[in-house]
Amino acid sequence: MNNQCGTSPIVGFRFTLSPMTSDFVSVIKGALNETDLQNVWRHTDDVSTVIRGRSEHVFDVAKAVLSHATKTGTHVSMSGTFSVGCPGDTMGDNLLDVTSEPANGKVATQYVSSQFALYPLGDLNYMDIIYEEIDFAKARGVFNESMHYASGIHGDIEPVFSFYEATFDRVRAKTSHVVMTVTFSVNSPSHEGRHDA
């Protein structure tokens, strides 16, 4: 076990995929099977799926899984936690010695609404860091709204995930232990066919 924050290069993402359909099992399994997982370590149990590896591959896989799950038009929610530098983490169950080229790459255009909360753990200036990333989202054109306990991010799936990966890596460069919770909603009836911010 690693007892010091920030010494592990492993990024993890534990998520739950929730398709709003009675055929949810095939949607979840189909999304995982259609996603190229060769650059991450993955384990699925009865509650969630965890993927571990290098940052670029973890975000690439997360985006691909969500994209595959939503391509039929089914309303899908994905909720999860990205983490790096946890002092309780282990060096096992990971793939780090792999190519830097993402295995899945760009996905089809898809409007995504999401909410995130950022936790630069152990940093006394954590609020300054959080405000910087909210301003970063506004500059990227993906900021939706402020809300209790989270910030809204929306737009096409590519710039939305590009923002999340960039902001996670930006905070990671400043703070040794970073946690980011995100909930995505795609194909919601309330989106009215939107494709961008």
Question: Where are the model-predicted features located?
Answer:
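Charge-rich, low-complexity N-terminal segments
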Residues: 1-197
